[in-house]
Amino acid sequence: MRPVLNILFALGAALAAADSHAYCVRNALADRAVHAAVVASKMPAPAKTFSETVAAGKEFCCNPKNADCNPDRAGDAATVVFDAQVEAADAQAKTAQPPVKCGAPDPKEQNRVVAIAPVRGFLRFEANARFDARRRPGGDNPPFLLKALTADNKVVTTYSCPPHGVSETPHS
C-alpha cells in the first residue's frame, strides 16, 4: 500500500509543478474552438513554435523552457506575444463562421493583431456577457473576449475579439 501512496503523491506533485511552470491557453467557450500561436520577435524565426487549436471547454499548456513555447527565451517575469483567434468548432462550420481575431493592433506590423500574456500565465477565451446580439459584432460590440492572466489568476489585460479598429466580423 505504501508504494502506491508514494507513486500517487509523486504524480500529484508533478502535475501541480507542471501547471505552475507553464502557460496555458484555456477555452471557456462552449461552442467554438480557439487557436493561439506564439510570435517570435527575434529573427530568423525558429522553424517550429507553439501553435495549437484548443477545443471548446479544454486547455493546452506549454512549458516556457521548451524552445517551441518560448522562442525568444523570455525570463519568468517576461511576456509572450501570440496570434490568437476564435474559430468554428468543426470543419463544416468554418465556412459559415470565419475566424475572429483577438488582441490589439501590433505597432510593429500593420494589419496584424497580437495578444500579450505573462510567460507563467494564461490566455483565457470566453464569451462576452455584454455582447448585444441585436447589433453587428465588432470592436465596440465583441462577441468574445480574450483575457491575459497571471499564474495566480489576476487579469492583466482584456482583449476584444474582434479588436477595436480592426475590420469587423460578419454577422452570422
Can you name each region flagged by the protein language model?
Residues N6-A16:
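Bacterial N-terminal signal peptides
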Residues A18-S172:
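Intrinsically disordered, low-complexity segments enriched in small/polar residues
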